Amino acid sequence: MRALALFVTALWAATVAPASADGSRLDAIVERHVLRVGTTGDYRPFTALDKGTGEYSGFDIDMARALAKALGVSIAFAPTTWSGLAQGLAEGDFDIAMGVSVTLDRQKIGFFSAPYLRDGKTPIARCSDQEKFQTLTDIDRPGVKVIANPGGTNERFDRARLHAADIVVYPDNLTIFDQLASGRADLMITDASETRFQAKLHPGVLCAIHPDQPFDFAEKAYWMVPDPALKAFVDQWLHLAIEDGEFDALFAKWFR
């Protein structure tokens, strides 16, 4: 984590911008006393919604609460979906989305914070089948069923890289790994961080396949409306959270 901290510190120093005199989203958040956070609630360990209680939990939920505390405001979670995330940000349904993969298409719509996690797409499969699906060539064969949640970077990766395999779109990302465990699909290609977590939830049943050597490079960051003042605050807060140990403590809670 120290190497990541140094990288974030350097990037923060290069990107900090002064707050605008008036009319910034940061000012609006402080004036309304509420930070609105967009979250899908279906991406453990980053965000998960308990449908019984209506409560959210996860690493990015804890980080969002820490950000709201730093701002001196309360927090309101705005439910969204992966397919509706960009529209929600563009239309102002929320101020910031937590735990989002950095892409250039998303950069066109809003600002990203300094990245806080290196990631990448890698397979997860039943442990008995893990040797079958080591490479994209192994996976991209007729008859192989690759399950994906709709509208996010997982489905986009599959459709860009797989041409012979059968891509099965499943709408509920909270139960999608149960579909995999029960044999309704052969594998899923998702973020390495998620494969590690799901393998721990399904010991001996699901196995993360080479999560330390994913198929591509990706980073997680916080995605916000394009306001320089808000970005400067978020980057400064993240920098301090990494340096004072708050980030590491929350990361250990959810990932170790």
Report residues per predicted region:
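Ligand-binding clefts/hinges and TM-proximal coupling segments of bilobed small-molecule sensing domains
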Residues: 22-24, 153-170, 207-211, 238-256
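Extended ligand-binding regions for polar small-molecule ligands
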Residues: 61-70, 128-129, 137-143, 152, ...
